[in-house]
């Protein structure tokens, strides 16, 4: 017998809790639909950004995904090994690399994009078009505010004192 649901009333008013719960559900939807293509969320995002924007500096991709440079390098290494992207050294700045889609990466970006266009429908069936648009707008506002004003963590201060 399945246990009754835990009482989460003390968390239910927190935007972060609600957003995390929704994100978990949407990741399940992503895995169910896009998972068979053996794509991770970050890889899907990179493919779509490259398909929509053309070649992009590796640093800009890391910034767009709020990903540390070493983690982006590992992700791009994996994508390169699968034949989806190529990194080309910039002629202007030899320290910089531009990331390009290969033909295989372009096809995969299109296929995954087509799947993504409709995969959220069942999960969002309880929302009207206007509610969906409002949800996206509000989430973007939260993300933009965070990007504009990155709050200092109390851990940052503790690390400085410990050093």
What residue ranges belong to the model's regions?
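Helix-turn-helix DNA-binding motif, specifically the short coil turn and the N-cap/start of the second
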Residues: 68-71
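Short, locally clustered residues in the helix-turn-helix/winged-helix DNA-binding domain
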Residues: 20, 48-52, 113, 140
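Pre-recognition alpha-helix immediately N-terminal to the DNA-recognition helix
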Residues: 18, 25, 29, 45-48, ...
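Short capping segments at the starts of secondary-structure elements
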Residues: 53-57
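Charged, amphipathic alpha-helical coiled-coil/dimerization segments
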Residues: 27, 77-144
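The alpha-helix within a helix-turn-helix
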Residues: 62
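N-terminal leader segment of winged-helix/HTH proteins
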Residues: 1-37, 153-158, 163
């Amino acid at each position: 017998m399945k246990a009754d649901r835990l009482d989460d009333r003390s968390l239910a008013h927190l935007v972060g809790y609600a957003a995390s719960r929704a994100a978990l559900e949407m990741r399940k939807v992503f895995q169910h639909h896009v998972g068979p293509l053996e794509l991770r969320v970050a890889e899907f995002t990179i493919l779509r950004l490259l398909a929509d924007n053309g070649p992009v500096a590796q640093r800009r991709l890391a910034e767009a995904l709020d990903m540390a440079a070493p983690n982006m390098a590992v992700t791009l290494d994996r994508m390169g090994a699968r034949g989806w992207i190529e990194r080309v050294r910039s002629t202007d700045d030899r320290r910089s690399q531009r990331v390009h889609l290969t033909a295989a990466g372009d096809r995969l970006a299109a296929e995954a994009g087509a799947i993504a266009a409709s995969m959220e429908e069942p999960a969002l069936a309880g929302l009207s078009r206007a509610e969906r648009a409002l949800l996206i707008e509000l989430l973007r506002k939260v993300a933009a505010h965070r990007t504009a004003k990155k709050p200092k963590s109390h851990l940052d201060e503790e690390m400085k004192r410990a050093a």
